[in-house]
């Protein structure tokens, strides 16, 4: 990807970067360990974003 990005693409990338993180530990404690991991986790090489 080029260094010069359009602002809407940059915003989308920033949102996806924030979404791509593990589940906080306090959520696991709150739900009684029923939610163990973030199912929507994305690896940069395996799954590409459709931008």
UniProtKB/Swiss-Prot annotation:
Xref: InterPro entries: Ribosomal_eL39 (IPR000077), Ribosomal_eL39_CS (IPR020083), Ribosomal_eL39_dom_sf (IPR023626)
Segments of this protein annotated with the region Disordered: 1-23
Keyword Ribosomal protein: yes
Keywords: Ribonucleoprotein, Ribosomal protein
GO biological process: translation
One Pfam family hit: Ribosomal_L39
GO MF annotation: an example: structural constituent of ribosome
Record's compositionally biased regions (Basic residues): 7-19
Coiled coil: none
SUPFAM superfamilies cross-referenced by the UniProt entry: Ribosomal protein L39e
Family (UniProt): Belongs to the eukaryotic ribosomal protein eL39 family.
PANTHER family per UniProt: LARGE RIBOSOMAL SUBUNIT PROTEIN EL39, RIBOSOMAL PROTEIN L39E
Subunit structure, as described in the record: Interacts with impact.
Protein name as catalogued: Large ribosomal subunit protein eL39
Species whose genome carries this gene: Caenorhabditis elegans
Taxonomy of the source species: Eukaryota, Metazoa, Ecdysozoa, Nematoda, Chromadorea
């Amino acid at each position: 990807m080029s260094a010069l990005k359009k602002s809407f693409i940059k915003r989308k990338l920033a949102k996806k970067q924030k979404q791509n993180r593990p589940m906080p530990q306090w959520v696991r404690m709150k739900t009684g360990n029923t939610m163990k991991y973030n199912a929507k986790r994305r690896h940069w090489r395996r799954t590409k974003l459709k931008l």
